[in-house]
Amino acid sequence: MKLDPKALRYLSKDDFRTLVAVEMGMKNHELVPVSLICTIANLKYGGTKKSIQTLHKFKLLFHDGRNYDGYKLTYLGYDFLALKTLVSRGVCSYVGNQIGVGKESDIYIVANDDNQEMVLKLHRLGRVSFKTIKNNRDYLKHRKSASWLYLSRLAALKEFAYMKALYENGFPVPTPIDYNRHCIVMSRARGYPLTQIVQLRHPSKVYSDLMNLIVKLASYGLIHGDFNEFNILINDEEEITLIDFPQMVSTSHLNAEMYFDRDVTCIRVFFEKRFNFIGERWPKFKDCQNIHSLDVEISASGFTRDMEKEFQDLSKQQDDDEINNNDSDENDEDDDEDDDDDDENNDDDENNDNNIENENEENIKKSSKVNKKEVGKEIKKEEEENNNSEEEDEEEEEEEDSDSEESVEDNTPVIEEFKGLSLNKNRDFKFSNLKDEDQNAPIVLRKEFIENLDENQPTEPKKEKVELTEEEKQRRKEEKRQKMITDKVKRQLGKTMREKVSVRNNVKSRTKKEVQAHISSY
């Protein structure tokens, strides 16, 4: 979204108060309801709803009423909040043209009351070209999700911290002035992007300066991570200025060597393609030495508090291991003496164990005698119960058999005959029952059956064909020809006279004589 600060002059204090209320509500709401905005803004006489309408008119708020009536900040509204704060601090007073666009930021020229030109960088994460920010950067850390505005704010904070630390340590970077939310104000570096340079007077000097800069960053415990021709500015004196720092990582990162080699190869490949310069030497990550711990001061990616604790724990373990190794020889001699004492103690323990086992066996025998008597009584009871149950089951089975015999006698099949056909023979059909039926019954095929039906039906007398004479044939041909001609003429007349209503009426009013005269012309 392009920054258009013209609407700043039309916004009142209540409007900015409402914007701040929406920003506060977005900490735990994706869409802030209107009721919450009113309570946070705390304006009188329904002024919040009026200011919401004006902010929505200038596209500073986004409205979504699908689930409930809610609003959220747009990037333009976030820009206005940051600019309002920077103006109140006296950092900038004028906003100029846009001088650069990147995959994650927009760059504008601003000026203060003294007409000193500066650069305003607005971070805009979440664009189509760079939506993998959550996977490629560690802004979220332990959080699962966050809004793009919050991620842009973290990126700006991180870049300002890196820029300030590098500037204080003498690196060729722009001068950091101030920041607020997702905006950074820095001095304007005089130069051109290296990607726009076609020819250099001293390519070897520039190449060596860039490689020395990579090594110097590594000596301070930092790796740029995106050291290419798009993030390097060069002036007319071939002096270098480094920009764009949110992706910097520490040399203690797990993939530090990969990032370091990638920065080196980017410069080598660019100089070879653009200036036909092949560097004979280039730095390697193994040769770099950490002289300063700048990554710890600014908490660069890859070196966190947990890593500091782990480093301290490892150092303590190493010290303990060294002490244990020194004492191991003395402990070996003491172990031999202890082994002899352990053998004597083991003999005494075996005697005690044997006595305990004998006592346990006697107790088990006594308990087994008592248990046998009780088990015998229980077995007798179970046998008596089983005998009684078997007798009862036999009596029930006899009663069921007698009932089934009576039901069979009562349910004897009654065969009713209708025109010599038994009705219930189809239920229990068997091939053996075919003997009872007439085996000499004729078998009639479908074809014979149909022929018999045709013979029985009455036949109509056939009409005799009447042969036509030649005169009648010619007369019929003439009639067909005349009919075809009349149809053709009517169709043509209908096509030509169809567009105009008056002509159509004239065609309908024509007499038969005119039509016949037209037909005779053929």
From Swiss-Prot:
Q: Any idea where the Protein kinase domain is?
A: 93-248
Give one GO term, molecular function aspect.
protein kinase activity
Q: EC number(s) in its UniProt entry? A: 2.7.11.1
**Record's Gene Ontology CC terms?**
cytosol; nucleus; preribosome, small subunit precursor
**Positions with a binding annotation for ATP:** K121
Annotated stretches, region: Disordered: 313-435, 452-484
- Which reactions are catalysed by this chain? L-seryl-[protein] + ATP = O-phospho-L-seryl-[protein] + ADP + H(+); L-threonyl-[protein] + ATP = O-phospho-L-threonyl-[protein] + ADP + H(+)
The organism's place on the tree of life at top rank:
Eukaryota
Q: Which cofactor does it need?
A: Mg(2+)
Catalytic class of the enzyme:
transferase
Tell me if Magnesium is a UniProt keyword of this record.
Answer: yes
The catalytic site is made up of: D226 (proton acceptor)
What do we know about how this protein assembles, alone or with others? Component of a late pre-40S ribosomal particle.
Question: What role does it play?
Answer: Required for the final endonucleolytic cleavage of 20S pre-rRNA at site D in the cytoplasm, converting it into the mature 18S rRNA. Involved in normal export of the pre-40S particles from the nucleus to the cytoplasm.
Record PANTHER family: SER/THR-PROTEIN KINASE RIO2, SERINE_THREONINE-PROTEIN KINASE RIO2
UniProt protein name: Serine/threonine-protein kinase rio2
- Species, as recorded: Dictyostelium discoideum (Social amoeba)
